[in-house]
């Protein structure tokens, strides 16, 4: 079985498990499973990876997008620049696991503005990992932006 999942503190609001279960079924991937992993503290991350040998990838949500970074073996250059990770890929070699963090919010935000005029000013609401990705893109485009 190829396991994937979402980690966060409280996941009752999440539709990720339903979404990915339907996606795996639609793509005829009975070998894939998506689970929710509520962690009371990010220090539980390494034990989660260690105790689930079929776990190959995780989405990261509130409040762990920033605090997971020091626990990873490697962080993608863009995710390091943003200071937030929302996706972790887990490479397995026997019992050993190598974790690599990425930030897919950056590319998602860039693509959402493709074909649109880039603003000269922007107000970003929120202070979490997704807001950090938005600010990163706007600053790359020399947009005068404020964070609230």
Which residues does each predicted region cover?
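Phosphate/diphosphate ligand-binding glycine-rich loop within oxidoreductases
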Residues: 2-116
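Glycine-rich adenosine-cofactor-binding loop
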Residues: 8, 103-106, 113-114, 119-141
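Short coil/turn segments at beta-strand junctions that form active-site/ligand-binding loops
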Residues: 53-56, 120-121, 143
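NAD(P)-binding Rossmann-fold cofactor-contacting core
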Residues: 141-148
């Amino acid at each position: 079985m190829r396991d994937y999942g979402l980690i966060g503190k409280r996941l009752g609001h999440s539709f990720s498990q339903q979404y990915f279960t339907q996606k795996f079924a639609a793509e005829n991937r009975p070998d894939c499973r998506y689970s929710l992993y509520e962690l009371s503290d990010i220090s539980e991350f390494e034990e989660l990876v260690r105790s689930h040998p079929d776990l190959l990838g995780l989405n990261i949500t509130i409040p762990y997008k920033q605090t997971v970074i020091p626990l990873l073996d490697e962080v993608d250059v863009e995710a390091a620049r943003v200071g937030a990770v929302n996706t972790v890929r887990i490479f397995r070699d026997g019992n050993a696991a190598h974790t690599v963090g990425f930030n897919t919010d950056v590319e998602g935000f860039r693509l959402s503005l493709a074909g649109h005029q880039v603003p000269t000013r922007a107000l970003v609401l929120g202070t979490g990992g997704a807001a950090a990705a938005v600010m990163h893109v706007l600053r790359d485009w020399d947009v005068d932006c404020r964070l609230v």
